[in-house]
UniProtKB/Swiss-Prot annotation:
Protein name: Small, acid-soluble spore protein C4
Further remark: SASP are degraded in the first minutes of spore germination and provide amino acids for both new protein synthesis and metabolism.
Any one GO molecular function term: double-stranded DNA binding
Site feature (Cleavage) residues: E27, I28
Length: 69
């Protein structure tokens, strides 16, 4: 039966992950030449977020033996 609790709670599961993700965010923004902030376009911010996701997936695949699921 379905659980009524939302699975999208943004709760950190790994201690220190927030700092690592923030560091990754600023490194990628620097690589892309994006200045993060309120004046940055959604497209620019989205490109940084998309790249974070891409790199996290690559890291997970490497740790799982490089297999695709």
């Amino acid at each position: 039966m379905a659980n009524n609790k939302s699975s999208n709670n943004n709760e950190l599961l790994v201690y220190g992950a927030e700092q690592a993700i923030d560091q990754m965010k600023y490194e990628i923004a620097s690589e892309f030449g994006v200045n993060l902030g309120a004046d940055t376009t959604a497209r620019a911010n989205g490109s940084v977020g998309g790249e974070i996701t891409k790199r996290l997936v690559q890291l997970a695949e490497q740790q799982l033996g490089g297999g695709r699921f």
